[in-house]
Amino acid sequence: MVTRRRLHHPEVEQVSKRQKVDKAESKNKKHADVAAERGEQSTEDHEDESQDKKDKKVVGDNRDEDEEVSPNGQEAAEDNDDRKDKDAKEKDTETNDEGTEKSHTDVNDDDDDVDESKEEDAAAAVDITKEKKDEQESDNKTEEKKVQENEEEEEEDENKNDEDVEELGSTEPVDDEKKGLVKFEFDGVEYKFKERASVIEENEGKIEFRVVSNDNTRENMMVLTGLKNIFQKQLPKMPKEYIARLVYDRSHLSMAVIRKPLTVVGGITYKPFNKRQFAEIVFCAISSTEQVRGYGAHLMNHLKDYVRNTSDIRYFLTYADNYAIGYFKKQGFTKDITLDKKVWMGYIKDYEGGTLMQCSMLPRIRYLDAAKILLLQEAALRRKIRTISKSHVVHPGLECFNDIENIKPIDPMSIPGLKEAGWTPEMDELAQRPKRGPHYAAIQNILVELQNHAAAWPFLRPVNKEEVPDYYEFIKEPMDLSTMELKLENNKYEKMEEFIYDARLVCNNCRLYNGENTSYYKYANRLEKFFNNKVKEIPEYSHLID
């Protein structure tokens, strides 16, 4: 009974309900807002049902009291009092029973709330799991979509590259521009030539060629400093102070290759002698990382056009070291100095170990268009050949060699076009003979080594009779390295012994004419020692050296 009364107390019941409702709400809020709303709705429904039961019970009690109370007589009053006492006892009993029933109902309701809360928690957990699963599936779909997009982009890039390759292999004008090809027509025939990378970059505005001097302007001084740094790096044997002095000398000019905005790639420093119509190229260098793009040749062409158009200079002179001789030869320089010595002797610096080279500029040639001019000359020559020869006619190939099992010799004169080309049986015999002897390659290598040796500069060319008038009175069999090179090209050396004889003759003549204390005598000894060592390195000719 105590338990029933305690459960029947309305405040205890209300606190218990609120605690359970709060607990259910806190759980539901952690899982999902939907579960919380369901829990609140369930709690409100239970409270409404309990309140409806209380209201119905109170209304029933009031009706009973109204029916039992009567206004007539004392007996009625006593009976009424007795009934009131009896009704009060019955009411207490009913109230207790009702409280017991209500307490059982509340307990059942609480159990239902707990069960519903658990069910709602489970439902919320299922919803959260479902949401996570949906999010994961969405992420997977997004990743798959990204991967698919990347694959599509890669395929597009590959297709684009394939299209570019196909375009480069075609003959459309746009593709020729991509490859740097320049087209023009001559006599209705289309000709093409490929521009250097440096020319393409200049046309695109990536590089420029600028003439600068020491005029104290900030930008020109920056360019000169960049040139000085390149010269000092590319010409390590030159004293750095000497390079700086000449680059900043106000009597010198420089043409620089500049990658925009202001990065010096290379250049040429030269000293003009306008009254004597020549200029001395003092330094010429391109940065080591940029030498494969044709900057050197394009720079020299720019310099030739600039000097010829702005002055009376018609010749270039320079002392080239062993590594620069090949470059200067390609740019039109030669070792044969045709310019009178009275014009340049004493005006340019003589470098020990360097080779003096000269370039004579043609007045009617624009060197930047030299490639196109040469191609036009070739086209004109081919046109002339077509008027006197049928060499441009292409005959079908021979079919007699298709059957390999039944090959038979044929008369060369029966081959279409062979006779018209001027072929004779004697020409076949000459063609089968070896052009060079077995010793040609060895002689050529040794001769190149001799010409590039530091002590060879006095022996590169024949002695000038004007400079040394009595030389040929003492030396009856003169010899020099350029004469040996000419004899080699004309197949005059039939044996290695003949080449060795001429090489020793060069040194013997020098020692015969010059005294032992002269530098020329020492140069001859050094060069002969170097020559003997080179021949000994070749096993088949080492026995020829004593």
From Swiss-Prot:
Acetyl-CoA binds at C284, A285, I286, Q291, V292, R293, G294, Y295, G296, A297, Y323, A324, I325, G326. The record marks E280 as: Important for catalytic activity. It is found in: Nucleus. SMART domains: BROMO (SM00297). Residues 207-362 form the N-acetyltransferase domain. It catalyses: L-lysyl-[protein] + acetyl-CoA = N(6)-acetyl-L-lysyl-[protein] + CoA + H(+); (2E)-butenoyl-CoA + L-lysyl-[protein] = N(6)-(2E)-butenoyl-L-lysyl-[protein] + CoA + H(+). Keywords: Activator, Acyltransferase, Bromodomain, Chromatin regulator, Nucleus, Transcription, Transcription regulation, Transferase. Residues 108-119, 150-175 have a biased composition (Acidic residues). Residues 1-176 are annotated as: Disordered. Its EC number is 2.3.1.48, 2.3.1.-. Residues 9-44, 51-62, 81-107, 128-149 have a biased composition (Basic and acidic residues). Residues 434-538 form the Bromo domain. Its main location: nucleus. Coiled coil: none annotated. One of its GO terms (cellular component) is SAGA complex. PROSITE patterns: BROMODOMAIN_1 (PS00633), BROMODOMAIN_2 (PS50014), GNAT (PS51186). The active site is at E280 (proton donor/acceptor). InterPro entries: Acyl_CoA_acyltransferase, Bromodomain, Bromodomain-like_sf, Bromodomain_CS, GCN5, GNAT_dom. Belongs to the acetyltransferase family. GCN5 subfamily. Histone acetyltransferase that acetylates histone H2B to form H2BK11ac and H2BK16ac, histone H3 to form H3K14ac, with a lower preference histone H4 to form H4K8ac and H4K16ac, and contributes to H2A.Z acetylation. Acetylation of histones gives a specific tag for epigenetic transcription activation. In addition to histone acetyltransferase, can use different acyl-CoA substrates, such as (2E)-butenoyl-CoA (crotonyl-CoA) and is able to mediate histone crotonylation. This is Histone acetyltransferase GCN5.
